């Protein structure tokens, strides 16, 4: 149990970085995909999200190590010293959750955009971008925040596997 307590701060740091990365990428991606529904951007982003949901953390971790550590030499393949060493583990851990958050945001935005109050605000002459940012996105984030809260526990569990793959 002492070993667990020694490694727990690193687990928390990895989980926080992965969640931050997932939210910063996924919420705008899902919102834009909803606004540009049935376009090439929407299709590509949702295919990437589907791949993200389907890909196991250990497999993505190995692919990231092969590409960014061994081939390109941009990031260290193991260790937990410095900021560069947390990038690949955070991407590997956050990618699956990023996909889920993007899909939830898109779905919630599509539902919100179709609400009567959004049509009313648009009929009053408010610019579409303002309607999306101030009215639709704010209300669409309620289910997204719920999903984010639930995924924190999954990330804490998944970080053990990520730490093993990256010898972090």
PLM-predicted stretches and their roles:
Residues 1, 69-88:
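Hydrophobic alpha-helical transmembrane segments of membrane transport/permease proteins
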Residues 1-7:
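Membrane-helix entry/capping segments
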Residues 47-76, 92-97:
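Membrane-water interface segments at the C-terminal ends of transmembrane alpha-helices
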Residues 8-41, 57, 80-168:
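Alpha-helical transmembrane segments of integral membrane proteins
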